[in-house]
Amino acid sequence: MDRQISTGLSLLYDIMDIMEKLLGEGDYYDYGRILSYHAPWMFVIGARGLGKTYGAKKLVIGDWIKKRWQFIYLRRTAEEQKNKGTWFADIAEQYPELEFRVSGNQAECHWLDDRDATKDKHGKTRPTWHIMGYFIALSQAGQVKSVAYPKVRTIVFDEIFPDNMRYLGGEVTALEEFYNTVDRWNDRVRVIMCSNAVTLANPYFSAFNINLKPQLDNHTQYQRYCDGFIIVELADYGGFSAKVAASKF
């Protein structure tokens, strides 16, 4: 059995290598299909350069524009959030009607046409900055248990399976508690967990009794687990055209 699992993972990694060579700078992952399964927790595993993070940004920015939904960009530690100031750098030009900024732990924007601007006491126009999302480290999530996030629709947990295999102590429980803090049992929040690689020995699959072997053996792109609460996508099994949108531009 171990040999069969090893063979399945080896094939998956071979496909990932091919995908990395095929992907161009203008390609990005489209979350439309996996969202159609309506699973609250989604694991998206695919080649580096697939555009998973870019696609997630496009999704949550679109959610704010259309419905004013907010997001949380989650990383494991505060150290992993140190580059949050550049979070909008690769996507800002796609939204010429908006100006973006990161203020503290908040992602913010305002309309460049000043449609909802205000005037100060001197009559000068002041842009109205809106909170689009929050940058939070899971290691510090216990500090926000009393904070309400009623407008958050999506949590994006980037690099859920770290290359160095270093997880937090009690990490799965911490994520479950954080999810409940944000969702407040309203069944409103969805969690997108992205990874460039997968190892079967990880605390998440162990906690939820996820056996990936049949999915690997059958080259199945999407598979539900835990009565549909969780879905795992092995994105590289879908073929280039199945999961990559035409272009950023």
Where are these regions (language model features)?
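Phosphate/NTP-binding elements of NTP-utilizing enzymes
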Residues: 2-249
